[in-house]
């Protein structure tokens, strides 16, 4: 079973990269974790065209039987404990899970339709790289909650 974050864009600034790498390393103690990045659409593309280009790249990275969770501002919000329970349910039976983060124009209808659930990290808009960090930290927190470890207090 793999747990993956599939996201549009790369952290060019390097601002969040060290923290993301640290939480990814910690997650590796509990589950096979992978961060997959696809390129952002060309800037000259219109919003719909950009979303479609990014959708094509995102969908190509998803396995046919992989459980897909899309991050979307209209998605469900959970507490960390409720999120941990959701992660437990998603990973039951050894099925691969991919949490998908779109680009600055969001996710296309095709990606949202492929998703089994949608998740909102916050009702506030987060920078995409910050959302990636928050998600990876919450995945790590979920693993520690599920194992009764003291990280989550």
From Swiss-Prot:
S-adenosyl-L-methionine binds at residues 71, 102, 121-126. Keywords: Cytoplasm, Methyltransferase, rRNA processing, S-adenosyl-L-methionine, Transferase. InterPro entries: Alpha/beta_knot_MTases, RlmH-like, tRNA_m1G_MTases_N. CDD domains: RlmH-like (cd18081). It is found in: Cytoplasm. The keyword Cytoplasm applies. It holds the Pfam family SPOUT_MTase. Its main location: cytoplasm. This is Ribosomal RNA large subunit methyltransferase H. It comes from Anaeromyxobacter sp. (strain Fw109-5). The lineage of its organism: Bacteria, Pseudomonadati, Myxococcota, Myxococcia, Myxococcales.
């Amino acid at each position: 079973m793999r747990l993956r974050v599939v996201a549009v864009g790369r952290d060019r600034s390097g601002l969040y990269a060290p923290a993301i790498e640290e939480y990814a390393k910690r997650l590796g103690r509990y589950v096979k974790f992978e961060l997959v990045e696809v390129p952002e659409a060309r800037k000259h593309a219109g919003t719909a065209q950009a979303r479609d280009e990014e959708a094509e790249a995102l969908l190509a990275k998803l396995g046919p039987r992989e459980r897909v969770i899309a991050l979307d501002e209209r998605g469900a919000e959970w507490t960390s404990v409720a999120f941990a329970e959701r992660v437990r349910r998603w990973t039951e039976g050894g099925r691969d899970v991919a949490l998908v983060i779109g680009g600055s124009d969001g996710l296309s209808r095709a990606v949202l339709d492929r998703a089994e659930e949608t998740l909102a990290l916050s009702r506030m808009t987060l920078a995409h790289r910050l959302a990636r960090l928050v998600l990876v930290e919450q995945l790590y927190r979920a693993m520690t909650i599920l194992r009764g470890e003291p990280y989550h207090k």
